[in-house]
């Protein structure tokens, strides 16, 4: 049986992330895991059609990361206060790429993440972070769409 000593819960701070917390906490408790909660703050380098002077970009990115940390701390305090959270972290970058990188750097054993279940044009326009993580991660990824419940 695989051991999941470190579980990563990447969040986008939406209600979708909050909805899957029972799955995340159940897995963390079942395997007595250290839970890493990660928010990736999308930065300007990924908006290549907008021109903003470099100094403004650095200031903006610092504010985005600081604001993300504040919101993530609130999210954890509200939703995960009774669980085994060991790391709460905000990093700048592209969410899909940074989640996969975090898995490798931190030695994560399992990723548990939400999926919005977008289809068609929405998926083409917005992409799928979950799909990228599932197809490129070196560890198992459990995806949960909280809006698709068993009947």
Task: Please provide the spans of the model-predicted regions.
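Short beta->alpha linker loops
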Residues: 67, 90-94, 116
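Gly/Ser-rich helix-loop-strand patches that form or flank binding pockets
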Residues: 101-151
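Structural beta-alpha unit
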Residues: 1-2, 30, 76-111, 148-151
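Small/aliphatic-rich secondary-structure junction motif
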Residues: 2-54, 149
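Hydrophobic alpha-helical membrane-association signature
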Residues: 20, 68-71, 129
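A short acidic, glycine-rich active-site loop
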Residues: 55-70
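General small-molecule cofactor/ligand-binding pocket signal
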Residues: 38, 87-91, 142
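Phosphate- and divalent-cation-binding pockets in alpha/beta enzyme and binding domains
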Residues: 19, 98, 120
């Amino acid at each position: 049986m695989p051991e999941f000593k470190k579980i990563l819960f990447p969040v986008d701070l939406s209600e979708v992330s909050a909805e899957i917390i029972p799955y995340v906490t159940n897995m963390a408790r079942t395997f007595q895991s250290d839970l890493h909660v990660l928010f990736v703050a999308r930065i300007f380098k990924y908006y290549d059609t907008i021109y903003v002077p470099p100094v403004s970009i650095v200031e903006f990115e610092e504010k985005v990361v600081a604001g993300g940390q504040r919101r993530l701390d609130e999210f954890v305090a509200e939703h995960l206060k009774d669980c085994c959270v060991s790391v709460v972290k905000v990093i700048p970058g592209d969410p899909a790429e940074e989640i996969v990188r975090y898995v490798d750097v931190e030695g994560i054993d399992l990723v548990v993440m939400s999926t919005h279940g977008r289809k068609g044009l929405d998926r083409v326009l917005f992409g799928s972070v979950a799909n990228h993580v599932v197809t490129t991660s070196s560890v198992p990824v459990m995806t949960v769409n909280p809006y698709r419940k068993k009947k």
